[in-house]
Structure formats: C-alpha cells, structure tokens
Amino acid sequence: MASLIIDVFLLVLLVLIAVMVVRTCKLYAVIVMSGAYSLTSAAIFVNLDAVDVAFTEAAVGAGISTILFLAVMAYVPADEKPGLTRNFLAGFICIGAGALLLLAVTDLPSFGDPMSQVHQHVAPRYLTESGSALHIPNVVTTVLASYRGFD
C-alpha cells in the first residue's frame, strides 16, 4: 500500500512539473524544472528497483544537462521575446506524426510477452556473451558500461 502511495505521488508530481515546464515563460525556471523532472524520474526508477537507470537519469538528466543548459543561457540574449505566431502546418504535421505513432503502437507485442522478438535475440546474447567478451562478471554492469555507452 505504501508503495502505491509513493508511486501515485511521484507520478502526480511528474505531471505537475511537466505542466509547469510547458506553462512557464522564463528560461531559467524551465531549466530548473527540467532538472526537477529528471530527479523525479530518477526517484520513480529507484521505486521500480532500477537503481542503475535512476543513477544514469540523475547524473545525465539532472546533472550534466542542467549544467549545459545553464551554460548555454549565457549566450541567449536577455531581451529577445518569442513571437506569438501560430504555425498550422507544424500542428498538422505533429498531429499526423502522433496518429502514425498510435498506429504503430497497435503492432507492438503484448507487454511482458516472453516470446516477443526482443527476448529471443538481444537478451540471450547479452547473457551468454557479456562475461566472455568483456570480462566483466556482472551482466548489468556490462550492459551499462559497454553497450549503453554508445547511447
């Protein structure tokens, strides 16, 4: 029951931060809230027992990205104001892309299906070859340090 309360609280907090990011016009506030969004995502990953993913999200999403955004802010003119124009072509393209994504989701395998293609190809390869190919005994460390390093 406590885990459910924590999950609901973190998801509500994540949605609130996302709404605040969209509604805020101040660039500095958006950067700070983006860092808060990443930290909240990291907390959700910790609650899901994915501590390695949480650590990566906290380090990259809240740490390095926030520092880089703040560094870029030094090059953004303070007096520049965005125009209030609406681009209907961009809106139609976004709606079309969203419709195509929804169509593609219907073709995905069922959630948790052990016979889906991803479980037949990649996971067995990681489990059998990670120790001998990279000489790291822990499979999770191998995937994070070697294979995910390309991301």
What are the functions of these language-model segments?
Residues 1-150:
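Alpha-helical transmembrane segments of multi-pass membrane proteins predominantly involved
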